[in-house]
Amino acid sequence: MHVYFRGPVDFGLINIDIQPVPCVRNTDSERYKELIIKDIISVSSNGAHLCLSGLRLHVNCGYVAALNGFTSDGEYFRDNIFVVNLRNMAGDSGGPIFYYKKFTYVSLNGILQGGLDDFDDDINDITGVTTISSILNVFEEP
């Protein structure tokens, strides 16, 4: 099974025969190279401290700036996003957005959509995050 969507929610799924461990890559840490995902929690307040594990920048953190956001590039309209003030680079898209619970445990909050340009086409550490609930709702059984 290969499934992908570009709109209204941008994500992809691949069914393979392995037993994955739900974890976040944290390779810059000598002690905690994997952070185990314990649960999925929706972000419910501005100012919440969240982190990203990206391929290029690895783990870095910021604060929620806006809930219930949307973005459009003129071709695609995407809602069900929230905005976090944290830096990301090309290649970090698709990385998990998470909240630290304990040293090796995290809560999954979203998936990085990418940097969002402002009116002057500057990113300025503005990051769009796809909500986990919007992804899960696509596959929810009636």
Predicted regions span which residues?
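Helical hairpin unit composed of two closely spaced alpha helices linked by a short loop
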Residues: 65-85, 94
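Catalytic nucleophile loop of clan PA
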Residues: 87-111
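A short, structural micro-pattern
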Residues: 7-8, 78, 91, 105
